[in-house]
Amino acid sequence: MKFLTLALSATATAMIIVNPEQQPLAPSIVQNPQHKSLIELAPYRTRWVTEEEKWSLKLDGVNFIDVTDEYQSGSYGTLHTTRVVHYPGAMEHAHEILPLTETLDKSNMRSNLEHFTSFYTRYYKSQTGIESATWLFDQVTAAVHESGASDHGATVERFAHPWGQFSIIARIPGQTDNTVILGSHQDSINLFLPSILAAPGADDDGSGTVTILEALRALLRSETIAHGQARNTIEFHWYSAEEGGLLGSQAVYANYKKNQRNVKAMLQQDMTGYVQGTLDAGEKESVGVIIDYVDQGLTAFIKEVITTYCDVPYVETKCGYACSDHASASRYGYPSAFVIESQFENSDKRIHTTEDKIEYLSFDHMLQHAKMSLAFAYELAFAPF
């Protein structure tokens, strides 16, 4: 996530539409200065910055996408349109999903998060960032193998990046190539000195990482899913380098667009564990459904998922441009949505510091996000796109 830190702060049609937040054409860009990155602060509003200027912007709560690779490849400014996808108007698989939600285990999430935050930092350019990714890859691989899904075509892939820390993609094939994706980001950062200071990243985004890992484990308890008998393909993504400007997820979705991957829905889970800010504001526990820079049809569907399967309500909230990896999916023409732990203004202010620790998180609240993730994946696994 990119915002102010502590103290500094249902058949797809052939119709094509343009994301309402997108602008028509990119302006000209000043030639690349040496050792700088090109960032996009709003649609087609760019600036060349140093690495230090990147972190300064993040400390000031400024969102951005690092589009340097797009610029260097000559593809920056390409307008990727989004196909309209019709999502189910009602939940149709409660009989199968509710027993699966009973298998979600908070103790799994806690033990996984305790280990994940034990790495000194998961900064995407660090050695421990590679080590944490390797550990996570092993957990995802074990979940897939233990379910028997790998005997039916399920795979776990390391998606390589030039900075070292790789992204992780678990793919559970269905009967079609229509693909439903749940995402989180695995990297962490300490914005004061990213290469030196500790960054436990418990909430941002260790919480989302273990939330969708637990949803994957529960989902694969369905023999129908694990044996590849669902209508659609399901993927779980753990992106590298979100904190550097959505670098990992951009690379993934650029690859998917190049290879004409048929993505019907993408849901991001970034920060799922902090509820105290909501309670301190005198409000009831809820989850925050992002309503800006997202696909409105998919967002409406997710509201129905929450209402049906979660024990807490949702509230609508906004997080601005490029606030997490769902923006990369949208950028490449794939419908995406994002649900966060609370109203945006009540979310965790300890992120990007040494104080982003487990002790401040609620695993009961994370369980609500896991229920939502599980139900989202199962319902759309059988949607007649």
Swiss-Prot record:
GO molecular function terms attached to this record: aminopeptidase activity; metal ion binding; metalloexopeptidase activity
Subcellular location, record wording: Secreted
Record propeptide residues: 15-85
This protein's GO CC annotations: extracellular region
Origin superkingdom: Eukaryota
A Pfam family reported for this protein in Swiss-Prot or TrEMBL: Peptidase_M28
Organism annotation: Penicillium rubens (strain ATCC 28089 / DSM 1075 / NRRL 1951 / Wisconsin 54-1255) (Penicillium chrysogenum)
Cofactor(s) essential for the protein: Zn(2+)
Alphabetic keyword roster: Aminopeptidase, Disulfide bond, Hydrolase, Metal-binding, Protease, Secreted, Signal, Zinc, Zymogen
EC code(s) of this entry: 3.4.11.-
Homology family: Belongs to the peptidase M28 family. M28E subfamily.
Name of the protein described by the UniProt record: Leucine aminopeptidase 1
GO biological process: proteolysis
Intrachain disulfide bonds: C319-C323
Subunit structure: Monomer.
Binding sites annotated in the UniProt record for Zn(2+) 1: H185, D204, D270
Gene name of the record: lap1
Details of cofactor binding: Binds 2 Zn(2+) ions per subunit.
Reported function: Extracellular aminopeptidase that allows assimilation of proteinaceous substrates.
Coiled coil (residue ranges): none
Signal peptide: 1-14
Amino acids binding Zn(2+) 2: D204, E243, H352
